[in-house]
Amino acid sequence: MDEKKINDRCKIIKNVFLFAFVAIIVKILYMNVVKYDYYANLADNKTYKEVTIKAARGEIRDRYGRLLAGNENQFTVQISINEFTKNDTTKDKSQANDTSLKIINLLEENNEKYIDEFPIVIKNGKYYFTYDENIKQYKDNNDIPQDLNAKETFYYIVDRLIEDGKLSESDRELKATDLQKKVNAAGYYPPILVSKWTFTEEREKNDWLEKYRVEKWLKENNKKTTNITAEIAFKAVRDYYLIDSNLSDAEARKILIVRDLIKSQGYTKYQPVTIASDISEATIAQVEEYALELPGVSISNEPVRTYPNKTLAAHILGYIGKIPSASESQYLNNEEIKYSKNDMVGLSGVEKSQESKLHGTDGYQKVKVDAVGNITDKLEVVEPVSGDTVYLTLDKDLQEVTESALERAIKAAREGGVYESAYGNVAVSGGAKNAKSGAAIVVDVNSGEVLASASYPSYDPNLFVTGISYDDYQALQPKNTNDLLAPSPLLNLVTQGVFQPGSTFKMITGMAALEHGLNPEYSINDPGVIWMGKKSYGDAVWNKSRSNHGITNLYKAIQESCNIYFYTIGTGENRVGGADPNAKIGPEQVMEYAKLFGLDDYTGLYEDLGVGGESKGKVPSEEAKIDSTKTMLKTYLNKVAKNSFTDITKDKNPEEFSKRIEKIANWCDEENTPTKAEVLSRLEKLKVKEDDLETLADQIVYTYLNFAKWTVSDAFNLAIGQGENAYTPAQVVRYISAIANGGTLNQLYVVQKSISSDYSEVDVKEPKSEKIDFKNSDNLKELIKGMKRVVTEGTGKKVLGDLGVSIAAKTGTAQKSTKIPTDNEYDYLMSHLSAYNVNKAEVLQVYYKLRAEREEELTKAKIEEIKEQIASKDTDEETKEELKKQLEEGVSEKLAETDRINAAYLRKAIKELNHKITDDDIDKFKETYGDFAWAVSFAPADNPEIAICVMIPQGNTSTYALLPMKDIIGQYMGLNSKSSNSTDNKTDEEKDDNLQEDSINFSTQLKK
């Protein structure tokens, strides 16, 4: 090659380098001169970040300023994500996985509680989605059959609300989204997306599976299944994080707890993740000692919610937790209050209702970070502003006494012995072995302020402050989920427990009669029992000892709880001889006065306890009974008559089937109840199969039509607080307060005021009340005379008579005559097959056949739902494609393997093989529920200040409900404690046997 060519090439290379150099210089000048401001601002934005400084939540204090819920700076274990994952450069070794396992093991070794939100649980070698468990728990807690899908569950709730009178029959025909609004307005919030007919937990599960691309993993690993089980998902997520195959699934789950927490929270590198709070000094020392082995793990100090009194007033205070996914947009898009995804918010009670006041304003710290997100310098700091302080109407001391007294009374009812009180001990015989829960509420009769409210058993809201563990949450669930009365720590019986009030209702019947002309001196000669045909309606003294109350006026009737007197004045007719009461009264007037006393309404506490914090009973009515019967009849026919017509079936002709069922149900409205012969004729015209005629006619006539109308039995039950009467203790104490204060119905409330952290704003709650429109409110004084005699001469004498203060009271018991479900109904049924005269092999054969038929129905229904959603204009294209994919892959619905579902189908199989057996026959080996024990009072009787209501499910006798009142009144009135307490050898129950009130549910008797 000649020299000239070489020189030419060198020149070319030089020129290239020169051009590049010039271009670089020009670019530098351009960036530093022309675009300096732009790039300087961009650099600042990339290197300066704001790190949130959490604001303390506002405190909650009692009426005197004593702390009920506060905050304390706790040491927490946090993970800085950039340090945690920065060395994960190979597929063979993951520093993040190693660190995750080490920190969880360290926390466990030190008995520290840590946040565990990984949605797959492994128990006894089986894998479960917590999403599925939450759906099961929701159904159990709300007495919903486990085999119902989302749509069926929603309409099951709707039918129940119609039956309770909270929705109308016409509401059922509304568009699903509009109906959902009505259901919500009634205080019920089913976790169901009606637009897609799926549970919110199902949607969350699908989102979670999508996040980890589990379907893609299935294809890559040639897994030919559309049913993604918890075990399959676990393996997929394990592979996603490249967890060492030598580790067990239990160890892998510890890693996944940390990895999933980080991923699900969506934290940026400079925002740490809290994995454990309130850790011990020993744990702090170990984390610092092993710092080199735990990259990214550090100790921090931040405000954490604390409840210093643990379980005290837990149901009023409520608890906090992470923002529910279903409510995420509501919080994160809030323009007035700024929330971040990891904020803790009030989920129940005052914590929920006062969320906007209690939530503080976070501060921030402006920091400088390097290229990989590490903090290199701390700059500006804006301090956080704590939330408002909320003051309650509660008196902490009275609350403590109320809770303690209630718990001791329940124990005394169950075990007997001595109820120990500073104001005088009381000997009791016990025997109410299933008395395990109860409620007590104390209110100011003049304002409606709640001074104390106790529900037993309770719970410690501290469990929720950093996220409750799965095991802790399960421990708070009823031990027997089949039993509606099983103790449930999270349930506030004061405002959410609806029960028959028994004889505590009798003052309403008395007031209705007085307002319509009754002379309180009007007397009957009580024989102890009324016979109407073969049916008896007796006093408690008659049922126990064939005794009676003799000559009885209103005062004595209240004192001794004479049922027959209230039958008489509640119907305006004397059925035991002598003159009728001079009162134009019947069930309509009793219902009217029950409503005047607020028993058809919420008490007002729902405003302070958050959505869902208060339920309410309904005053019974003839219309409600007919509607309820129609709903039950339709439910029955929908289940048993789906293939009972010769020309149609429920599945193939749903519209015509519904029309015929509606027509049958409307027979309940007829003035003259159709006879069996008439019903048989009508069913034939509706083309019911000959084989089904007799069975359907018997059920329609004798189970439904004959009990649709209002009867004398219903009128009697209404008058004495039995039958369809059912109210919360809060509703009852509100009505008793109205008697005490001369006829003013107060809204109950528990939030007194709030004060901002800088004391610049004070928001005081104004009491709400209305004067009841009585004809003569002086009639209330006649009721009070009788209530005072309960304490001076009646059932309350031995418990409250020695307090040295005038007290007005009334006791009551109400019977729940049904059987107590076992904690394993399937095993119960299997263990008694021989008594049911059925063969085990045959029963199981029918059992599996019935399950298969139901699964086929569910699958068909699901396919139809999917097709409807695809055809709907409201469904977006992305969702339509997903639904089409589901149809292509094949839809297969399976019944869950739960005790409730298994037992339901086993029971059906038994009845199919033995047509003569009834549910009563099947359940005859079970215990019967004990009576509800009630007591109400107010004191001082002549100038009332407080009213009290105590209720103990299965307490058997009302004496036990009186016991807590001794301590409550003593504490409130500041009475001197007894210097020496003595107990009678004979228990109060034995002395007062002849004074106990009626506990018979006549409608139940008649049905039997």
Task: Please name every model-derived segment.
Residues 1-385, 396-400, 406-439, 445, ...:
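Membrane-proximal periplasmic segments of bacterial cell-envelope enzymes
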Residues 33, 410, 740-743, 972-976:
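Short, hydrophobic alpha-helical segments
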Residues 69, 75, 368-383, 394, ...:
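Beta-lactam-recognizing serine transpeptidase/beta-lactamase-like catalytic domain environment
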Residues 390-391:
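Acyl-group handling in specialized metabolite and lipid biosynthesis
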Residues 762-769, 778, 979, 983-994:
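Conserved catalytic/cofactor-binding microenvironments
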Residues 943, 953-972:
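Amphipathic oligomerization regions
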